[in-house]
UniProtKB/Swiss-Prot annotation:
One of its GO terms (biological process) is glycine biosynthetic process from serine. The gene is cpr25. The keyword Oxidoreductase does not apply. Transaldolase involved in the biosynthesis of the capuramycin-type nucleoside antibiotic A-102395. Catalyzes the condensation of L-threonine and uridine-5'-aldehyde to form 5'-C-glycyluridine (GlyU). This is L-threonine:uridine-5'-aldehyde transaldolase. It comes from Amycolatopsis sp. Its cofactor is pyridoxal 5'-phosphate. The modification N6-(pyridoxal phosphate)lysine is found at K229. It comes from the Bacteria. One of its GO terms (molecular function) is glycine hydroxymethyltransferase activity.
């Protein structure tokens, strides 16, 4: 029998931590926040339902739980995503970034035994991509990337030697925008049958908001990724293309690799996309501006911010800060946490051995953080390092400097 007292303790802890989380400042680059509007479907009955009939075929209602709101997916979600990406073909069914990766790779990689090229994890590629390719029966080849530029000499060698079916550009750890057009040019010159897919999970919101270039405009055949990093959506994935045949190939792979596509989350993605159509451009521009300002302020306070020889710190949402050894890094990470500020520690960032704070400014921006909030945040980092103002209210001081959020506050 369930111990109800124990259950009460768990619920009390959950609720108290949830209240605390409402005032926290989250600086994890791979996380963001759902707006109140986008959260609505997650508390609805549709969280419990399947939905397969996206063609709205009147003779195919085998699962009727979502019938009355089907257009929220087939029109609201798909239409807004399509307009944001300027891509007529959208697959909104992946349930995560890795789910989108698996579907894209299976649909576009050709027959087992062929080669899939991805970005070397040591230079910022996703840790799972090469292994995913091998598990799906492909040979894996990797290319290095430096400051957003794929090593062209290495890529030419791979294209000529392996004639790969697919190049899967999966840059996750980067302070630079990925250069896609040069890769597309090389593919066109050396291996015309090779397809080019760009996984822009980390920069999805910056791409769809127009602050970074659209890979499809730069020559990519397809693009996709997760929808909860710089894009303020639910934990889902999405795939885009302008080519009907490639859309169908990914659709066929998805059909055999994914059953439940998490209907409520897909409705949440639709509402988030509708909001993003309104707020997205201003939000995306503010994210990059905030990241660059935060880098400058931290450097002026004596923090070791990753900086190129030309002074460049970031053109994405990511800021990298070297604190010291593992003990020193953990100490300041815990101190910031005690202030209500949550940071991400990584030990494998390109060109920065050892533990590093990998910081992202997207969520703070989404809830209304602009210049004043970024200045307040930099002061709290200095407080945490110096061990002063240890009152647990650092995040509240930052949040008090936030203005209007980049989402609707009042809705019908």
């Amino acid at each position: 029998m369930t111990d109800t007292n124990e259950l009460r303790k768990v619920l009390h802890r959950f609720r108290s931590q949830q209240e605390k989380a409402e005032f926290s400042v989250n600086l994890v680059p791979s996380e963001n926040k759902l707006s109140p509007l986008a959260q609505l479907p997650l508390r609805s009955d549709y969280y419990n339902r399947y939905f397969f009939n996206d063609a709205l075929d009147p003779g195919f209602w085998q699962f009727r739980g979502g019938q009355d709101v089907a257009e929220m997916e087939t029109e609201l979600t798909v239409d807004h995503l399509s307009r944001l990406a300027r891509a007529p073909h959208v697959n909104e069914r992946p349930i995560s970034g890795l789910s989108a990766m698996m579907i894209a790779m299976a649909g576009l990689g050709g027959k087992p035994g062929g080669t899939v090229v991805s970005i070397d994890a040591a230079s910022g590629g996703h840790y799972a991509t090469a292994s995913m390719a091998r598990r799906l029966g492909f040979e894996s080849a990797t290319v290095p990337v430096v400051r957003g530029q794929v090593d062209e000499q290495r890529l030419e060698q791979v294209l000529c030697r392996h004639e790969p079916e697919l190049i899967y550009l999966d840059l996750q750890n980067s302070r630079h925008e990925l250069e896609v057009s040069r890769v597309a040019d090389l593919v066109g010159r050396h291996s015309r049958q090779t397809l080019l897919h760009v996984d822009c999970s980390h920069t999805m919101g910056l791409v769809l908001g127009g602050a970074l270039g659209n890979p499809l405009d730069a020559g990519a055949n397809t693009m996709g990724g997760s929808t909860h990093k710089t894009f303020p959506g639910p934990h889902k994935g999405v795939l885009f293309t302008r080519t009907p045949e490639l859309h169908q190939r990914m659709r066929e792979a998805q059909f055999t690799m994914l059953s439940s596509h998490h209907f409520a989350e897909t409705l949440a993605l639709g509402l988030a996309s509708a909001e993003f159509s309104h707020f997205g451009p201003a939000y995306a521009e503010q994210v990059i501006g905030n990241a660059q300002l935060f880098s400058k302020l931290l450097a002026s306070e004596g923090f070791d911010v990753a900086t190129d020889e030309d002074g460049h710190t970031t053109s994405t949402h990511q800021i990298w800060v070297k604190i010291g050894d593992a003990e020193q890094t953990d100490r300041i990470s815990q101190s910031l946490y005690d202030h209500g500020i949550r940071v991400n520690v990584q030990v494998d960032l390109p060109g920065m051995p050892g533990p590093v704070l990998r910081l992202g400014i997207s969520e703070l921006t989404f809830v209304g953080g602009r210049e004043a909030a970024v200045h307040a945040l930099a002061r709290e980092f200095s407080n945490a390092r110096a061990g002063v103002r240890r009152d647990g209210s650092g995040s509240r001081r930052v949040r008090e400097q936030c203005g209007s959020p980049f989402h609707f506050v009042d809705y019908p």
